Design a protein with these regions (language model features):
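Compact soluble domain cores
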Residues: 1-63
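Short, compact, well-ordered microdomains
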Residues: 56-94
């Protein structure tokens, strides 16, 4: 069940370059759904709790996901405080 609306979803050039890999595309879609449903991925417990507070307080949300079959593939998903936009990016693009 969705915890929030993500607004316009964007991806960065680094993520777009990896979308040629169908497995990466599936990973990205599953990760986005997890983010919207409040599964914050590989965040520490403190950061997960901060996201739960951010849902109530209207602050920015961030999740981290690591691809199981390709551990070097990690994406960050950030939703703006006003929920107008969500960006999927590689950590190196932050």
């Amino acid at each position: 069940m969705r915890k929030f609306e993500p607004g316009n979803v964007h991806s960065t050039p680094g993520v777009n370059a990896k979308l040629k890999d169908a497995g990466f595309m599936r990973f990205m879609i599953v990760s986005l759904n997890r983010h919207i449903n409040g599964d914050w991925g590989s965040m520490c417990d403190e950061d997960k709790a901060a996201n739960e507070e951010a849902l109530v307080d209207g602050l920015r949300l961030m999740s981290v996901y690591k691809r199981k079959d390709h551990p070097d593939d990690t994406i960050w998903i950030i939703t703006e405080a006003d929920r107008s936009a969500t960006t999927i990016l590689l950590p190196s693009e932050y």
